[in-house]
């Protein structure tokens, strides 16, 4: 039984301090939340960045400052910067973090409804993102909000338009307008990826804990964090990303699973070890 990889999505692009005052905006706040998640058991940090006033940005320099500050404190953590950004951003804006040559980055696998907005990921956009990641030696985390997104990216991999096996998928379930977060849907998604692939689930909102437990039982991995959910339980806001990660650790240990550290996560994900 492989160890469980926990990813912490520490701020996202949508959630605000008005919803939970612990949501990080500044560089110092991002480092604080990164450390809380790492110390609780997260091997991976999924990174969005904000301006100090909370405005989402895909600016290369802002990503560099934030990621450098985190790396100084957590030298072995895996960071996966977002290329999803926020709805309405151009593909050129969204690609900026790949200029930093991270180990991994997200690649969203199709257009979908996103609440009242459209998350636009056309085939030309996806090809451009795949080309950049191939050129820069970046392993994508393929974010799939709908079942068709899996088929789309598998077809692209066969054509060499995106990096192929071993592939890492993140199933984002529970976004309003996309695939509901049910155990049946999660199992179906997981059954559609190639042998040798790895996968993680992001359960959005109240679905976070059901999806976490189901993924652990199925042999998958788990993403939690303020981007996806700000509550530990009904009416109980988390005081940090670390509290959310710690809850996943408790669930995993009750189910007999050990937690992967960053070195073990790199091996599971077929990443190069740190030098």
Stretches with model-predicted labels:
Residues 104-227, 238-239, 243:
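Catalytic alpha/beta core domains of metabolic enzymes, predominantly
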Residues 42-52, 79-83, 143, 265:
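Short beta-strand segments at enzyme active-site cores
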Residues 18, 43-66, 114, 171-173, ...:
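Glycine-rich, proline-tolerant flexible connector loops at the mouths of alpha/beta enzymes
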Residues 2, 8, 55-81, 128-135, ...:
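Alpha-helix-loop-beta-strand connector modules within alpha/beta enzyme cores
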Residues 246, 250-275:
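Mid-to-C-terminal alpha-helical segments outside catalytic/metal-binding sites
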Residues 30, 37, 48, 105, ...:
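Conserved, mostly hydrophobic/aromatic
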Residues 1-22, 106-113:
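N-terminal small/glycine-rich loop or linker at the start of catalytic domains
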Residues 27, 57-121:
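Active-site beta->alpha loop and helix N-cap motifs at the rims of alpha/beta catalytic domains
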């Amino acid at each position: 039984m492989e160890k469980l990889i926990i990813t912490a999505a520490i701020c996202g692009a949508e959630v605000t301090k008005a919803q939970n005052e612990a949501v990080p905006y500044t560089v110092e706040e991002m480092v604080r939340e990164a450390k809380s998640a790492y110390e609780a058991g997260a091997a991976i940090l999924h990174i969005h960045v904000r301006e100090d006033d909370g405005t989402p940005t895909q600016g290369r320099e802002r990503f560099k400052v934030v990621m450098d500050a985190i790396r100084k404190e957590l030298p072995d953590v895996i960071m996966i910067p977002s290329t999803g950004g926020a709805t309405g951003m151009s593909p050129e804006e969204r690609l900026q973090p790949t200029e930093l040559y991270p180990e991994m980055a997200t690649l969203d696998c199709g257009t979908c409804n996103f609440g009242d907005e459209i998350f636009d990921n056309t085939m030309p956009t996806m090809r451009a993102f795949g080309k950049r990641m191939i050129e820069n030696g970046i392993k994508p985390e393929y974010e799939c909000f709908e079942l068709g997104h899996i088929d789309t990216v598998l077809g692209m991999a066969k054509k060499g338009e995106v990096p192929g096996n071993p592939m890492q998928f993140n199933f984002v379930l529970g976004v309003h307008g996309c695939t509901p977060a049910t155990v049946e849907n999660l199992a179906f998604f997981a059954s559609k990826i190639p042998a040798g692939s790895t996968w993680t689930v992001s359960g959005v909102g109240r679905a976070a804990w059901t999806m976490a437990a189901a993924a652990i039982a199925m042999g998958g991995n788990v993403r939690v964090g303020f981007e996806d959910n700000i509550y530990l339980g009904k009416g109980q806001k988390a005081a940090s990303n670390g509290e959310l990660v710690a809850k996943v650790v408790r669930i995993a240990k009750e189910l007999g699973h050990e937690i992967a550290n960053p070195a073990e996560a790199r091996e599971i994900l077929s990443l190069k070890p740190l030098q």
